[in-house]
């Protein structure tokens, strides 16, 4: 585009940019001046150019003062008169205070300590504390429709401001726009603090001599498109809450580190060119200078040291990274004209929204800008930031928001309340001090975006890899050394950033080629030297960043697509490492000498160090100073080795430098020609004497200027090499006993300090002895090499006989160097060969074939327990899981079993041996018949008084005291009632102790079943200590008290959450006070507040003695034994049985009333049946009487039947009366018999109580007789009735 949006690339523009920035700063500092005065001054300076060129744009035909008023009213056309008064009132208030930048009320709010941020997802306001390093967020309540309806108002921000300048000055050109853009780039907050009119005044002041170029008005369609694009980018910035640290740290998300990106002429996102010579005017998007670190101090930023470490590498790769990531930056996808137009319109658009937004809650500004640049109030901001964390979490939970940002909050542990927000989609935990991530992150199943960059993480929990919807994961700037193998379980992952870590290798088991959704992979600035073969087959990657590693990739290859980079690595073949012939020729050294590795260089240094040690001992120097120097130099040696390997991208560079040192050592008398260039790490040390060397060089050649500090000094002789490397690599004398002293005296011949004849003779003798020793060592090494060659030949012959392929043999670098340097005058000292110790046979090995395995009796977190027999002894065999068994695990297992089998204690399960075969590893222990304490406690049929339970807990404490008293300490790691076994004499023995190797190897499996017994610090993955066993012992005490399962009815996550919150198991009201106090002490959250097992023993012993005393007193006084348990199960409420006789008596007493009731009911039924039968007989007799009466009434009846029937009736009535009397007598007899039986039972009970003798058989006899006596009258009655019926 043309007009004011064009960019002027002339030198005059670059010179004006620095002046403009200074003028803008001065304008912002003196912004309290009146608006009309600034513009009037400009108009007075330009009286000759009034309103000549802007009649078409602004229709302003007034004089200078009226023009200023018109521009002011047009700039504030969207606001009311009341708003203008408020703005002017606030500006006046700002002028009364100290050097506070004046701002509108819609932007400042500096009087309030806490600002309000507008939520991006809803209209609710969120109070958020601001950290001093956070940038302001521009959240404006302007809808897209409002932007489209107010296009006429938006246009004047770009055009009217510049046109007013044309009307007043007639000199608004490209340089003006350039100044506007520079002002926007200098500080994002200055855009907010300055108004449209102050911008025009600065342009008028800075551009008096520029060319006259009139700006044409933009078309509404073009402006509408540009505004829509700017609005979308600004909404994206608001949604992601970009911070100033993003550009400083260089995490690669919204932008890269500008210290890397900036070149001598680099085009920024606003379209202007930054010069490499102007450090103060070159700024990034966040508003901070590139080469200045004034915004962030070392104390405020824990990551600044990391950026400084990589500064040299970043400078080398600056241009390269600019070219490589050109396709990923949004700004570089646009043309230059579009960038220029966007920058100009962006300034006007922001200014328009400054006037439109009057609510303080919509805009927030960092407070550190208003502290005069001296950092005042930063400590208060840090406190507010810590206080702000729970407020953010609570606000997100209340609003049901899907995004939570806790970045730059100095968190060491993630708050547990975060895991309760299950609706989270976006979680930002960057720029904290996190070392571990809780396993509860697996609860956030809806999480899509997770940022953990700029922390101290070394590993991730396995629950994180089960998140099904995670698409973006940032892990850059941490301490990862390997790529997690479980990362391929994140099937939805699209972006993965592992840059700026310490990754040295990517395992083939990672299977990154199977992650088809992964399109962006960032592995910058690690220590990768190769990639797995299956990763090279990945064809789904669209972005692959590999710069800053040790891969053989140059800039041209890194610019290519990921597929081309991977194809190049597939066909790459590493060349043979050779010494650079050019460097050797410059140093006048024999080019046939091969390079040496790190170990050989250190060996050379150690020889010099040993020689210096001997000379210092002869001089009897202070040993304390010597030890301090030893420690310092040992650290410097490690630093030398690490930094040389890390700083050099090529692996051969360090070897070349080491080779130069060796060559200088082997040829001390070489003529001084071109000097040797050594790394700066060797030479930037003030105590090494390099300054003296420089002084000598200056004395010899005064006209030659000394090199700067950044360049490495040079060494012209062997004495400086000796002094420098011996000072740095001074090692312990114990490590150098076998090393012979080095011929340092050869280098001392050239120095004027050693010219005595005696010293020369001593030196010659020492040289002869050293040469003899070295010759002997060479002979021994030659013999060893011959033996090795013979062994290799024998192995090759065996392989040829067996038909196996031959493997090429790789010689050691040290041996190669020694063999090739045999002909040289001064042989190279070497490191003594390591003696390989022959592994001793395992003493406690139990072959699996000798064990007869029976039924399974249990199952644990890392094995199954079987009952078995070994050599006639009943044993328990624990078969370990062999999922990932390797040789190291078997070796560690043997060491631990060797230690455990030597333990002997009555409260410890006896280890008898182990089978260490990789196919079936197992442990053999003694077998205890009663089983585990957990099964005994859950069996209600087994009665256990309080004294027995106290004794069981005391036995457990004794066993744990013994384990913790061993050296080294044996930590159980899984103490619970399932691992406490009971023998026949009710003695507890601790089982499954030790085996840290197996338990740590299967920690996840163990945690699944024993979460309720695990200490809080173990759940937080802070490691096991002996106090973790004390916490588990508290849960065991609770089980002994209640005989219940802890945390019954809760799943694992609920238990973990309750333990993290500090919740503990409920304490019953009937618990003894001393016992409850001990439990509360043992399950304290702070491990330091928990007692040790030696402290627990006397407490348990005191409670046992008190219970025994109470028990004896209660027995002597005839009272029941003291009971501790639920009141409903108290046996004292019931009469306890004394012996078997009383139990039988009680059973009979309960059975007899029931039998009597049944007999009475039967008698009543029988009597009713008899009465009914008699009534029927009476009715029949009445019928017969009626018939007889009828016969008597008739005279013709010849028989006297009436009298016969009357006699029979009388007889029948008599029999009936007799029967009734007999029935009554039987009832009376039964009652008497029952009374007699009751009397007999009472007498027997009294006799049993007095004598205690068992009941004789008389009870059964009487009982049978009573039953028979009841049955006989019934049979007699039935017989009598049958006789009567027969008679009838």
Curated annotation (Swiss-Prot):
GO terms for molecular function: ATP binding; protein serine kinase activity; protein serine/threonine kinase activity. Residues 376-386 have a biased composition (Acidic residues). Residues 851-1104 form the Protein kinase domain. Residues 1-132, 156-223, 269-386, 690-717, 733-764, 796-825, 1118-1141, 1245-1288 are annotated as: Disordered. It comes from the Eukaryota. Residues 13-79, 156-220, 1257-1268 have a biased composition (Low complexity). It catalyses: L-seryl-[protein] + ATP = O-phospho-L-seryl-[protein] + ADP + H(+); L-threonyl-[protein] + ATP = O-phospho-L-threonyl-[protein] + ADP + H(+). It holds the Pfam family LRR_14. The active site is at 974 (proton acceptor). Keywords: ATP-binding, Coiled coil, Kinase, Leucine-rich repeat, Nucleotide-binding, Repeat, Serine/threonine-protein kinase, Transferase. Residues 221-248 form a coiled coil. Residues 1-12, 271-291, 344-354, 701-717, 733-757, 1269-1282 have a biased composition (Polar residues). ATP binds at residues 857-865, 878. Residues 302-343 have a biased composition (Basic and acidic residues). LRR repeats lie at residues 400-421, 423-444, 446-468, 469-490, 492-513, 517-538, 540-561. One of its GO terms (cellular component) is cytosol. Gene3D superfamilies: Phosphorylase Kinase, domain 1, Ribonuclease Inhibitor, Transferase(Phosphotransferase) domain 1. GO terms for biological process: defense response to Gram-negative bacterium; negative regulation of cell motility; negative regulation of phagocytosis; protein modification process; response to folic acid; signal transduction. It is an enzyme of class 2 (transferase). Its EC number is 2.7.11.1. Belongs to the protein kinase superfamily. TKL Ser/Thr protein kinase family. This is Probable serine/threonine-protein kinase drkD. It comes from Dictyostelium discoideum.
